[in-house]
From Swiss-Prot:
Signal sequence residues: none
Task of the protein: This protein promotes the GTP-dependent binding of aminoacyl-tRNA to the A-site of ribosomes during protein biosynthesis.
The name this protein goes by in its record: Elongation factor 1-alpha
InterPro entries (alphabetical): EFTu-like_2, GTP-eEF1A_C, P-loop_NTPase, T_Tr_GTP-bd_dom, TRAFAC_GTPase_members, Transl_B-barrel_sf, Transl_elong_EF1A/Init_IF2_C
Source organism of this protein record: Eimeria bovis
Pfam families: GTP-eEF1A_C, GTP_EFTU, GTP_EFTU_D2
Length: 346
């Protein structure tokens, strides 16, 4: 979820003990901020909540300032510029400063929550890049056929285009594109669409596959990829050979930590050690990773939404990462009849 967001709203409690608990080493709040930054969410708003429950005085400016200072310090270490992060004192329970300015905190002169949200810069949608559309689902619709569904992350999808699906290399023509039951001339980044493809069985395309333009840097399967990874929670040490599940865009596939190349300083990114024997909670590292099954990923620089991932094991997020480079497999996939017609290949 975090990897799809344009802005992060970090909610921290202001009540006595509540903030300390949430913001402790064991608390989730720090992890949420780190996760957001690592996964490319560059805009942050902090809501300091439960202002109606501060002690000894309700709606305490002193408590607000104390929390703002501590959270700012942490956000700076993560990589955010606290000067650019609005801190809004709110009460979700009482409704203070959510959509209307509260008379309980006359000392606060900044934007209220809804204004801070309205002030977010919409990110530039990369429609000039080649098409990448990770599939969320594939439906079989009577009388229409196979309809893959997903969000256009980069580029443009149009009827008549011959798309290539990675990691299989399957090529076929797009007959039509729909969003919310309306036919589109073209779909652009951010659009959640369904598109109809001919001569393709539901078994051939799956969630986690990526549609791309067969004529413009088509997506391919990754033999391996190099990633910068931050370990958030692991009870022991992570050795080469560790194979947890990696969630990247809509794909959910076990990947092996094949080679631990370097251990890094988490804040500066400088190398601390080559070929470490293991890494543990709190470490950052450059790792060569190998998918256990065919998988399509991209470097973060070229295609950000396909270049960041979460590592999951033991029902929690063990690590997050950003892909630096991909070693691609040359795909020799099936070309359907409609693709041959559309491209004039016999």
């Amino acid at each position: 979820g975090t990897s799809q967001a344009d802005v992060a709203l970090l909610v921290v409690p202001a009540d006595q003990g509540g903030f300390e608990g949430a913001f402790s080493k064991e608390g989730q709040t720090r992890e949420h901020a780190l996760l957001a930054f690592t996964l490319g969410v560059k805009q942050m708003i902090v809501g300091i909540n439960k202002m109606d429950a501060t002690t000894p005085d309700k709606y305490s400016e002193t408590r607000f300032n104390e929390i703002q200072a501590e959270v700012s310090r942490y956000l700076k270490t993560v990589g955010y510029n606290p000067e650019k992060v609005p801190f809004v004192p709110i009460s979700g329970f009482m409704g203070d400063n959510m959509v209307e300015r509260s008379s309980n905190m006359p000392w606060y002169k900044g934007k209220i929550l809804v204004e801070a949200l309205d002030n977010v810069e919409p990110p530039k949608r990369p429609s000039d890049k080649p098409l990448r559309l990770p599939l969320q689902d594939v439906y079989k619709i009577g009388g229409i056929g196979t309809v893959p569904v997903g969000r256009v992350e980069t580029g443009i999808l149009k009827p008549g285009m011959v798309v290539c699906f990675a990691p299989t290399g399957l090529q076929t023509e797009v007959k039509s594109v729909e969003m919310h039951h309306t036919q589109l001339e073209q779909a652009v980044p951010g659009d959640n669409v369904g598109f109809n493809v001919k001569n393709v069985s539901v078994k051939d395309v799956k969630r986690g596959h990526v549609a791309s333009d067969s004529k413009n840097d088509p997506a391919k399967a990754a033999a391996s990829f190099q990633a910068q990874v931050i370990v958030l929670h692991h009870p022991g040490q992570i050795n080469p050979g560790y194979s947890p599940v990696v969630d990247c865009h809509t794909a959910h596939i076990a990947c092996k930590f094949a080679v631990l190349e370097k251990r890094l300083d988490r804040r500066s990114g400088k190398a601390l050690e080559d070929d470490p024997k293991f890494i543990k909670t709190g470490d950052a590292a450059i790792i060569k990773m190998e998918p256990s099954k065919p998988m399509c990923v991209e470097s973060f620089i070229e295609y950000p939404p396909l270049g960041r991932f979460a590592v999951r094991d033991m029902k929690q997020t063990v690590a997050v990462g950003v892909i630096k480079g991909v070693e691609k497999k040359e795909a020799g996939g099936k070309v359907t009849k409609s693709a041959q017609k559309a491209t004039g290949k016999k």
